[in-house]
Curated annotation (Swiss-Prot):
The modification Phosphoserine is found at residues 215, 222, 265. This is Protein ILRUN. It is found in: Cytoplasm; Nucleus. CDD domains: NBR1_like (cd14947), UBA_CF106 (cd14349). GO terms for biological process: innate immune response; negative regulation of defense response to virus; negative regulation of DNA binding; negative regulation of protein localization to nucleus; negative regulation of tumor necrosis factor production; negative regulation of type I interferon production. The keyword Protein transport does not apply. It holds the Pfam family UBA_4.
Amino acid sequence: MEGMDVDLDPELMQKFSCLGTTDKDVLISEFQRLLGFQLNPAGCAFFLDMTNWNLQAAIGAYYDFESPNISVPSMSFVEDVTIGEGESIPPDTQFIKTWRIQNSGAEAWPPGVCLKYVGGDQFGHVNMVMVRSLEPQEIADVSVQMCSPSRAGMYQGQWRMCTATGLYYGDVIWVILSVEVGGLLGVTQQLSSFETEFNTQPHRKVEGNFNPFASPQKNRQSDENNLTDPGGSEFDSISKNTWAPVPEQSEQDQDRLSQSSVNLSPSSPANNLSVVTYSKGLHGPYPFGQS
């Protein structure tokens, strides 16, 4: 046996080299991390399986096959505009994370892009949100509804933009969360939402002795009493001035009717005519005499 030359089968050597890849899920995660989360797990598994689960060969195959044909969109992370950013949050508390992003490329984003969870702690059941296609250099805010973990501590997760075909692009967005029992992030966001809702509601013009703590019926009765109180001096003066008759004006009109009803000249030849005048007799039951 000593000094024997043995030719090893290349296929057998390849199988031995694959024995070091113990877990396919670990290889997929490592492949995805090395590519900067530019490919989804299914795509990573495709290239790994094509190269017999050799990580180095799979990465080379990916760049050889994809690079000449890929037009990758561009995205730059601008800032974290979350309300209460930097504050800790209590356990099991809903909150909203908001980031400002920009299309930093020269072409518009393709339709169907989304912001997707790619690693770390997920913070709730939402793992992706749709994002509208941004024009070159356009800026937009993207919000994600999240929930803090049930235990206190420091947590982190990663999110990234993704095309409809599963191609990741742009900066990795990090979520770093401090969970404490006395955290104020949830309260801060609730107060901010109340203030926004109050400012958007139409304001009512308050007049008179309006009581904001009284029931609507009492306020309505108070307004009606101010307008229709029969015992008030203003109502008496208004009613008297409106409905009181004007006797002098009526008598003047009646006298004018009496004077202008018959006008006889002294030289009139009809001396046997009886002249009837009506002065102040318009209020009787028979203004023209009884028949």
